[in-house]
Curated annotation (Swiss-Prot):
Modified residues (S-cysteinyl cysteine): 134
Function of the protein: Catalyzes the NADPH-dependent formation of L-aspartate-semialdehyde (L-ASA) by the reductive dephosphorylation of L-aspartyl-4-phosphate.
Organism of derivation: Vibrio cholerae serotype O1 (strain ATCC 39315 / El Tor Inaba N16961)
Binding site for substrate: 161, 240, 267
Catalytic reaction list: L-aspartate 4-semialdehyde + phosphate + NADP(+) = 4-phospho-L-aspartate + NADPH + H(+)
A GO term, aspect molecular function: NAD binding
Biological pathway: Amino-acid biosynthesis; L-lysine biosynthesis via DAP pathway; (S)-tetrahydrodipicolinate from L-aspartate: step 2/4; Amino-acid biosynthesis; L-methionine biosynthesis via de novo pathway; L-homoserine from L-aspartate: step 2/3; Amino-acid biosynthesis; L-threonine biosynthesis; L-threonine from L-aspartate: step 2/5
Keywords, comma-separated and alphabetical: Amino-acid biosynthesis, Diaminopimelate biosynthesis, Lysine biosynthesis, Methionine biosynthesis, NADP, Oxidoreductase, Threonine biosynthesis
Protein name as annotated: Aspartate-semialdehyde dehydrogenase 1
Matches recorded under HAMAP family: ASADH (MF_02121)
Length: 370
């Protein structure tokens, strides 16, 4: 299968390439690399020679492919996808961008949760597969065991989202902000006799100063947070909050009888792991040990963390999870509102299960089925 790769140099694309090398995906395909800026230079070698870089906007070149995997972003998809389909191309389009997620012709792909839907689509002519919103995918990886049994009446998700979700430049800016804050009070920190209130005042002054680096976030994130992600919708939700309900229900195949999902999406100073505090209204009172068993056995990556302080502090954090495929779930307990209310907290890497991993796994599924 000739597979075109677009956006492979960006942050998500780089993680995708790393995972495809680790899983030897390149052994199974003929890779064709595309670029929007460096056409004609040698393509990267991920275990086999791929010739030269091709023009990512050349419809005739793209038409020669059996599949395209793109991490190039929404504007690329908006320009190229309709033109390619209108030109008669009938290959598989596998996309990280949000542009096509809610299109009827597209399946939001997360195979540990909706493999049956993916296989049905492949066997019935679906050719467009799109990775889901990062928080949605990570939430479903964590709680798939409850959703597949139809046990969730509604859910509220309060998110703690990493800088990586906003892009590579935002990650750099977060680190720069941390450095500027440290530099502003480094001499005071080195002096044990200095007043922490004086240090705190200086930190606040630094964060509020006009020279503080905020070109990307617009406001300080280090030492602070931003309780808004993406644009505003008419009902007062942010678009990120809207995605939780519509995308999760599409992945679960529940558009006709959706589970209400809503909450507040917040950007915090983590690098690349999103965390979520979840309030789950169950349809019935289920013993906690049974809930834990359902969650833990749903897929190979979810991990139930006992609701104890020390192991939670060690295992249920971005620092522990970053760079791994593990999706730990903890703080599992019944709530004061009633025994049919469940509290949970989960963490996952935004660039792996939140972005790159579903794309490469979709390619492997297509290869296996075809």
């Amino acid at each position: 299968m000739r597979v075109g790769l677009v956006g492979w140099r960006g942050m998500v694309g780089s993680v995708l390439m790393q995972r495809m090398v680790e899983e030897r995906d390149f052994d199974l395909i003929e890779p064709v690399f595309f670029s929007t800026s460096q056409i004609g230079v040698p393509a990267p070698n991920f275990g086999k020679d791929a010739g030269m870089l091709h023009d990512a906007f050349d419809i005739e070149s793209l038409k020669q492919l059996d599949a395209v995997i793109t991490c190039q972003g929404g504007s690329y998809t908006e320009k190229v996808y309709p033109a390619l389909r209108q030109a008669g191309w009938k290959g598989y389009w596998i996309d990280a961008a949000s542009t096509l997620r809610m299109d009827k012709e597209a399946i939001i792909t997360l195979d540990p949760v909706n493999l049956k839907q993916i296989l049905h689509g492949i066997h019935h002519g679906t050719k467009t597969f799109v990775g889901g919103n990062c928080t949605v995918s990570l939430m479903l990886m964590a709680l798939g065991g409850l959703y597949e049994r139809g046990l969730v009446e509604w859910m509220s998700a309060m998110t703690y989202q990493a800088a990586s979700g906003a892009g590579a430049q935002n990650m750099r800016e977060l680190i720069s902000q941390m450095g500027v804050i440290n530099d502003a009070v480094s001499s005071e920190l080195a002096n044990p006799a200095s007043s922490i209130l004086d240090i705190d005042k200086k930190v606040a002054e630094t964060m509020r100063s006009g020279s503080f680096p905020t070109d990307n976030f617009g406001v300080p994130l280090a030492g602070s947070l931003i309780p808004w992600i993406d644009v505003k919708r008419d009902n007062g939700q942010s678009k990120e909050e809207w995605k939780a309900g519509v995308e999760a229900n599409k992945i679960l195949g529940l558009q006709d009888s959706p589970v209400p999902i809503d909450g507040t999406c917040v950007r915090i100073g983590a690098m690349r792991c999103h965390s979520q505090a979840l309030t789950i209204k169950l349809k019935q009172n289920i013993p906690l040990d049974e809930i834990e068993e359902m969650i833990a056995t749903h897929n190979d990556w979810v991990k139930v963390i006992p609701n104890e302080r020390d192991i939670t502090a060690r295992e249920l954090t971005p620092a522990k999870v970053t760079g791994t495929l593990s999706v730990p779930v903890g703080r599992l307990r019944k709530m004061a509102m009633g025994d049919d209310f469940l509290n949970a907290f989960t963490v996952g890497d935004q660039l792996l299960w939140g972005a790159a991993e579903p794309l490469r796994r979709t390619l492997r599924i297509i290869l296996a089925e075809k």
